[in-house]
Amino acid sequence: MTTLRIPAMSPSGPVSVYRWRVNFDAYAHRAVDLVNAPLGGLDDLKVLLRDESWMREEAAERDIATFRRAQKKLREVFELGAGHRDMDAVTALNALLELHPMQPRISGHDAADWHMHVTSRGASVAAEYLAGAVWGLAVWLCEYGSARFGVCADERCGNVYLDTSSNCCRPTWTGRAS
């Protein structure tokens, strides 16, 4: 998320308050991170969740199968994008959106740390992570098109990527967000 300083009004005049802006690209990067991650066991899952301390702490063996299923289905979306099969990518993403629905809510203790969660209170680690990843990739597809994501063309690689380059012309993910 990005921190913005926005002036707010109080009885004594404007005050500066921190506000959070939702960064949908960060959610799309979750999809990339998941697809490219090894998921051999709980330790691997915790590495994937390294930037989200509460998720890392609450991750359990029961989450691994859910993450693996989503990993496979998300890879298919990236492969469809790489193959210029836009309608199929949209269909696959819509199916994932149904499997991992969002229920956005505002969280925080006061105006200085309001932020969004993509699932309801008490949702599992898998529900929170996957709803965000799928939503982020769907927003990315709508914003940039499937030509801006795919699978690395280097046969030794196979990683998926989001193309953040200025000219959208590299067949491998070097220099791209992965």
Task: Walk through the language-model features, giving the residues of each.
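Cysteine-rich micro-motifs
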Residues: 165-176
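Short helix-coil boundary/hinge micro-motifs
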Residues: 1-151, 155-162
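Residues that scaffold the ATP/ADP-binding catalytic core of kinase and kinase-like folds
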Residues: 160, 177-178
